[in-house]
């Protein structure tokens, strides 16, 4: 699957325990997206365009109205990246 660098960075953050919080307007349409890492930092690579691409490819999903998390398909699409945490 062809995944861009911002999509790859977002998926990697989600695979390590992050989440995507969304904000909706009065018509229940998504107006803002925030990708929060496991450590609580905000990932700037995750914007509305990246979010829509990941959702349309079904690499992320939301359960019971909660934050968006990575799916099994998303985990399979993530390329391994070295982890500098020791």
Curated annotation (Swiss-Prot):
HAMAP family: UPF0386. Coiled coil: none annotated. InterPro entries: YjhX_toxin. It holds the Pfam family YjhX_toxin. Belongs to the UPF0386 family. This is UPF0386 protein RC1_1783.
């Amino acid at each position: 699957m062809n995944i861009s660098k911002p999509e790859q960075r977002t998926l990697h953050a989600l695979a390590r325990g992050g989440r995507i919080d969304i904000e909706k307007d009065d018509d229940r349409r998504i107006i803002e997206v925030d990708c929060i890492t496991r450590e609580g930092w905000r990932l700037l690579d995750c914007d509305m365009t990246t979010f829509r691409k990941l959702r349309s490819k079904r690499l992320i999903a939301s359960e019971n109205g909660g934050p968006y998390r990575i799916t099994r398909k998303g985990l399979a699409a993530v390329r391994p990246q070295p982890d500098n945490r020791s």
